[in-house]
Amino acid sequence: MMHSGRVGQRFFLSLPLLTAVSLIAIPAQAEWYVAGQAGYSFAGPLRNVTTTGPFSGIELQDFDLNNSVAYGGKIGAYPFHGSLGFELDVNHSTPHVKSLGDSPGIHLAVTNVGANIVLRYPGVTFQPYLGAGPGIMIARLSRSAETQQDTQVSIGFNFLTGIRAFVTPKVALFTEYKYTGAKFGFHDAFGSFGGFDSTYRAHQLFLGVSYHF
């Protein structure tokens, strides 16, 4: 019998795919958009760092992360040009781990693939909006003096709010705030000694341009 946790994880991992299928199935009367975005990610430290593997259960100090540039893109739709929409949102940042005492820092890259439900005010010129949804968090830890190269995939969540302003009937500029949270498990980071679990949080600010059709 499959463990219920794995069933839940597979379900959430499939949500972006289900969102993509839903976007394809949206009626032709929908308002579609594609967008590019760039900004800055203010990552909090990796908290609740606990070892896994042969020496599991040891609590370590928080791993401070650097702020970094973030960039990505979106595709979404508002069925029947209404207030409720769906979007796929992908963004990438590099919140490298800062130096740990006498040890050098560790390169860390995070890709967030989000499937969001979005609610907007459908104004002609200005459209404030907010949204939320799960995200597939792909985090890659590079080889360093203290760690082995390791990649983890986990489920996180995204909350976003912003406002777009149409400069032409089809082109809009937007600014957006996004909050992201997830559990990261790098279980092979320390090689034969195991790895660690941790909690990731980030605040991100984006500027972007979208094309609506």
Residue ranges, per PLM feature:
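Outer-membrane beta-barrel translocator domains and adjoining extracellular loop/strand segments
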Residues: L46-F55, V97-P104, R140-Q148, G185-F193
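Transmembrane beta-barrel strands of outer-membrane/channel proteins
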Residues: G36-Y40, L88-H92, L130-I136, I163, ...
